[in-house]
Amino acid sequence: MNLLNLPKIELHCHLDGSLRVETAIELAKKEGVKLDSYEYDKVKELLVIPKECNSLEDYLNRFALPVKLLQRAENLERVAFELMEDASKENVKYIEIRFAPLLHLEKGMTQKEVIESVIKGIRKAEELYDIKGNLILSCLRHHSIDSVYEVIEEGKNFIGKGVVAIDLAGGELENFVKPYEEVMKLARKAGFRVTIHAGETGYGKNVRDAIELLGAERIGHGLFIFNDEEAYNLVKEKGVTLEMCPKSNIDTKGVNKYEEHPIYKYHKDNIKVNLSTDNRTVSNINLTEEFENVHKTFNIDFEDYKKIYLNSVEASFCSEELKEKLKLSIII
């Protein structure tokens, strides 16, 4: 299989974890952000996960510089455009980009301006490249629940205009779900689709709770459903798609190597999986490389690939009309 040329769907990709190193250097100089060095390799070290990373918390530290650099509308628009451009070059036909709007208000932008600027970058790329994109608004679990209400209140104005879903992200504690039950009910009522980061760091039960209490239609990672039989069966029975990012899970020590990752086992047991990068820069990976690693490890064939692709289309939060177009890309 020529994996580069095959069509792809990416459903789990963080904007602030996917900046080009060159762009980070330019923006740091423009914004007067002082760095020890502006040399490519030195800046890359600030953005890409170090080999000695031992946890999700260590991994999340790589976001400090990108967040500093993305406090102006033109910067957000640029990095959204560039992410779409990069994805299009490896034949990604559709991507859902996620980011947390409340992290980008430090220099006076409103949430409305933040969201608009990212959508503008996505739409500009759509005009130039054979790719479509939508936005998922992430809320961070270490922020207050009131902050989720803020995101819903502003974000609902963009549903159907570039925003499709809401997400809970950040460090994952056991039993984090329950306090979000009411606010996620409100989000669903407002028209948001729901995907939740859960089961990334050892707690399969969080996946079960995210589906049952928050109405999650997709799960970010879901790596550890194998340690909770009820969660495993629920995901399988309800056809909930797991947005799986093996390289990221290796980086955060969820697993130690590709051979230990359950993505292929889940796929073969008819659990719906999507393969994504999570953070292209932080994990130093693109989607073609991720597929190559999975192909090399598990010897997936074209039928496996096609099944994952078509499932990813169905699991996406885009329009039915676009889904039908995307399905045609894989008919060979």
From Swiss-Prot:
Any one Gene Ontology BP term: nucleotide metabolic process
Upper classification of the organism: Bacteria, Bacillati, Bacillota, Clostridia, Eubacteriales
Entry binding sites for substrate: 14, 16, 170
Needed cofactors: Zn(2+)
GO-annotated cellular components: cytosol
EC numbers, comma separated: 3.5.4.4
Pfam families for the chain: A_deaminase (PF00962)
Name used for this protein in its record: Adenosine deaminase
Gene (UniProt): add
Site (Important for catalytic activity): 221
CDD domains: ADA
A GO molecular-function annotation: 2'-deoxyadenosine deaminase activity
Active site (UniProt): 200 (proton donor)
InterPro entries with a match to the protein in the record: A_deaminase (IPR028893), A_deaminase_dom (IPR001365), Ado/ade_deaminase (IPR006330), Metal_Hydrolase (IPR032466)
Similarity-based family: Belongs to the metallo-dependent hydrolases superfamily. Adenosine and AMP deaminases family. Adenosine deaminase subfamily.
Role according to the record: Catalyzes the hydrolytic deamination of adenosine and 2-deoxyadenosine.
